[in-house]
């Protein structure tokens, strides 16, 4: 359980994401396989250091990609995967509770999972945090 292993898995996952993004427009199945492999690396990075928000959030994003793929196939498992992605976003948010972007991502996942009350709550949290960020930026410029 070393920092080197964490970085190795994180970087390997990032490289696979880049490949998946390139493949997505021409070969969806290849992109999906690359996202799944990236997700495995993000999972291992997250397990190496569960205090790092980046690996936790990237794992959520990998699960979102899989949820989208399942949704595109009209699979009943899509809702479960969206719910799993939402839970992983919440875990990432717990590691960085000031990140409105993560809260908004959790809101989106809950929405696609059909969990509308949770989606609304997470959206409000995200809007609040992102509004604070905008106000702080305005105040620092003025």
Predicted regions and their residues:
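Amphipathic alpha-helical repeat scaffolds of TPR domains
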Residues: 2-25, 51-72, 99-112, 137-142
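Residue-level detector of alpha-helical secondary structure
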Residues: 10, 14-17, 21, 32, ...
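Helix-turn-helix repeat elements of alpha-solenoid scaffolds
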Residues: 27-40, 75-86
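Short, charge-rich amphipathic interface segments used for partner binding and complex assembly
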Residues: 33-44, 108-112, 125
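Conserved structural position within tetratricopeptide repeats
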Residues: 40, 46-47, 87-94, 127-128
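Alpha-helical repeat scaffolds
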Residues: 77-90, 118-127
């Amino acid at each position: 359980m070393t920092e080197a292993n964490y970085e190795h898995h994180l970087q390997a996952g990032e490289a696979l994401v880049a490949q998946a993004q390139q493949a997505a427009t021409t070969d969806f199945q290849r992109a999906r396989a690359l996202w799944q492999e990236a997700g495995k690396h993000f999972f291992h990075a997250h397990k190496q250091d569960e205090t790092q928000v980046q690996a936790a959030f990237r794992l959520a994003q990998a699960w979102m990609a899989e949820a989208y793929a399942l949704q595109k196939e009209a699979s009943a498992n899509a809702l479960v995967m969206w719910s799993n992605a939402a839970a992983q976003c919440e875990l990432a948010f717990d590691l960085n509770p000031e990140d409105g972007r993560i809260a908004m991502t959790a809101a989106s996942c809950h929405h696609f999972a059909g969990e509308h009350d949770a989606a609304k709550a997470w959206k409000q949290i995200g809007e609040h945090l992102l509004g604070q960020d905008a106000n702080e930026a305005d105040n620092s410029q003025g």
